[in-house]
């Protein structure tokens, strides 16, 4: 090809999603096993009547519904909507970082942080995890005059860990106020006390804090792509400036609004996942696996160099999990019968490999 492309794209990997294998148990993408919440199907059907029209690019009705959901301290001006929270991550990089700037995050973490930073021409500062958890002290020590943005993935993907709420507060208090801190809470609905942070209070108290959430996970709208950010109005305005118009469809907006009206059902569903998470995690530890206490809808198995064999043998057993090189495996919490199949395989695998 003769067209001249940006040098930042050199070596940039293409994102590889979790595999879908017909007939196999998919525990690779952290999807909920539940369908849409009550009222969502009807909202989607009604929205299809107007698909010949462009959606509301400002997502005004959804922003108003989210502000009401978040509480009386928040108005629509505190909310930005994006095509999944991943697009909002990219928008945050766009509005803060360019060539010569630095973006800090723990590693291993969400796979799209590094390429998003690379495309911007900025430098990714990857701070190693401690005990599979973001090391906030080390991240603070990594702050320089070039730091523009810090991502705190909480719960962290793929390790399913959270930072202690008081430690997060101290960290935010210590970071210079001109540096934006993004708390990425894609899995926050699965966190339970005492590890549940009051991230919205951190937004209220600090104009340099933004919280990212999504409808893809607990709400079960992964196929519709809706996420949102909560932050200071000036920050929200900047996010809107780099938002690609019309990317959140009318159907997606309608489904998200309807989902907010099903809070009781959402809690019942997440409680069911949390119970299964505890069962799966305990059974894996009893079988001889090591794993940090999970706080999301998945479990992290730090298998090291044994990772490829586990993944291959799981695939042979018609179970698809998510590998991370030779670091470990992320296993989503599925339906009880899916989890039972995983546990049978895992017990057999560890017995054979450690015999």
Over which residues does each language-model region extend?
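Conserved PLP-binding catalytic core of the aspartate aminotransferase-like
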Residues: 273-274, 278, 282-317, 333
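N-terminal small-domain helix-loop-helix segment of the aminotransferase-like
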Residues: 2-86, 91
């Amino acid at each position: 090809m003769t067209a001249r492309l940006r040098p930042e794209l050199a070596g940039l990997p293409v994102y590889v999603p979790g595999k879908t294998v017909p007939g196999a148990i998919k525990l690779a993408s952290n999807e909920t096993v539940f369908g849409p919440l009550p009222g969502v199907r009807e909202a989607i059907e009604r929205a299809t009547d107007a698909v010949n029209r462009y959606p509301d690019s400002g997502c005004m009705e959804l922003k108003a519904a989210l502000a009401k959901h978040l509480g009386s301290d928040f108005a629509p001006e505190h909310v930005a909507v994006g095509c999944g929270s991943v697009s909002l991550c990219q928008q945050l990089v766009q509005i803060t970082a360019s060539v010569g700037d630095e973006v800090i995050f723990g590693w291993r973490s969400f796979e799209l942080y590094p390429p998003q930073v690379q495309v911007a021409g900025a430098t990714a500062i990857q701070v190693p995890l401690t005990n599979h958890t973001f090391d906030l002290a080390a991240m603070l020590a990594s702050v320089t005059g070039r730091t523009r943005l810090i991502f705190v993935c909480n719960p962290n993907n793929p390790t399913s860990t959270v930072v202690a709420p008081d430690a997060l507060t101290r960290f935010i208090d210590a970071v210079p106020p001109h540096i934006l801190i993004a708390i990425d809470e894609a899995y926050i609905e699965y966190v339970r006390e005492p590890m549940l942070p009051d991230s919205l209070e951190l937004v209220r108290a600090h104009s340099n804090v933004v919280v990212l959430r999504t409808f893809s996970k607990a709400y079960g709208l992964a196929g519709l792509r809706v996420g949102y950010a909560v932050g200071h109005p000036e920050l929200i305005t900047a996010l809107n400036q780099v938002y690609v118009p019309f990317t959140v469809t009318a159907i997606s907006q309608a489904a998200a609004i309807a989902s907010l009206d099903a809070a009781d059902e959402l809690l019942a569903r997440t409680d069911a996942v949390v119970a299964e998470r505890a069962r799966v995690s305990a059974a894996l530890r009893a079988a001889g696996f090591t794993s940090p206490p999970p706080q999301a809808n998945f479990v992290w198995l730090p298998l090291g160099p044994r990772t490829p064999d586990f993944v291959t043998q799981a695939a042979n057993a018609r179970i698809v999990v998510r590998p991370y090189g030779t670091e470990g495996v992320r296993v989503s919490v599925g339906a009880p019968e899916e989890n039972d199949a995983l546990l049978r395989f895992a017990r057999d695998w560890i017995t054979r490999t450690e015999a």
